[in-house]
């Protein structure tokens, strides 16, 4: 399942950027937001969808993965993971 950090790393590869400030500039956000992602916070749903589109990923699956990453409820996480797997195999 994709995570905020996975999305960030893939975006860095795609756009050939390496610094926090460069990534922030590509996304039009503050560099502290990107730094927070590197330190373990999750990105917003809107940005996750925007980055998924840039990367050519399934936006729905990406959004579900970010919601699971953010969730503190194990049952919720398991349900989301199951839905993601079902959609991948459909």
Enumerate the predicted regions with their spans.
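A short, Lys/Arg-rich alpha-helix, primarily the initiator
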Residues: 1-22, 26, 60, 64, ...
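Short amphipathic alpha-helical surface patches that mediate protein-protein
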Residues: 28, 39, 56, 67-68
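Key DNA-contacting residues within the recognition helix of helix-turn-helix
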Residues: 35-36, 49, 63
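Short, charged recognition helix plus adjacent turn
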Residues: 63-90
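Low-complexity intrinsically disordered segments
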Residues: 1, 30, 86-89
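Recognition helix of helix-turn-helix/homeodomain-like DNA-binding domains
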Residues: 27-43
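Short amphipathic alpha-helical segments that mediate assembly, nucleic-acid/protein binding
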Residues: 4, 48, 59-60, 76-77
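Short, basic-rich loop-to-helix N-cap that marks the start of a DNA-contacting helix
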Residues: 40-54
């Amino acid at each position: 399942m994709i995570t905020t950090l996975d999305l960030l790393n893939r975006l860095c590869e795609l756009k050939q950027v390496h610094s926090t400030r460069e990534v922030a500039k590509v996304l039009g956000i503050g560099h502290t937001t990107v730094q927070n992602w590197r330190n373990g916070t999750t990105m917003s749903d809107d940005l996750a969808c925007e980055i998924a589109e840039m990367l050519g990923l399934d936006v729905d699956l990406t959004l579900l993965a970010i919601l699971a990453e953010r969730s503190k409820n194990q049952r919720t996480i398991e349900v989301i993971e199951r839905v993601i797997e079902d959609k991948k195999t459909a």
